[in-house]
């Protein structure tokens, strides 16, 4: 009967400390700390992004470009595109004309 009483009562191993106890709040594993830091960073990034968007919406009405300024900006963008396309074509030609392309 003693064996039945032991089974009905507390387990024998309860007097021993558990090795797989959850860590105290002070002693969090490094992985949890990293996750919390990432969550905070994402939260702050999101807040900064929202703030930036609001500032842009407020500021957009104060930005008036004259026709000359608009043409100048468009010309700069076109020049950047032309140079970029030239570089892409030059790189393509160099890679295509290689005698042994698989040795690179």
Curated annotation (Swiss-Prot):
InterPro entries: TF_A-like/BEX (IPR021156)
Keywords: Nucleus, Transcription, Transcription regulation
Main localization of the protein described in the UniProt heading: nucleus
The keyword Transcription belongs to this UniProt entry's keyword annotation: yes
Cell compartment(s), UniProt: Nucleus
Residue ranges crossing the lipid bilayer per the database entry: none
Region described as Disordered: spans on this chain: 1-44
GO CC terms of this entry: nucleus
Source species, domain of life: Eukaryota
Compositional bias ranges of the Basic and acidic residues kind: 1-27
Protein's job: May be involved in transcriptional regulation.
Annotated family: Belongs to the TFS-II family. TFA subfamily.
Name used for this protein in its record: Transcription elongation factor A protein-like 9
Record lineage: Eukaryota, Metazoa, Chordata, Craniata, Vertebrata
Gene that this sequence comes from: TCEAL9
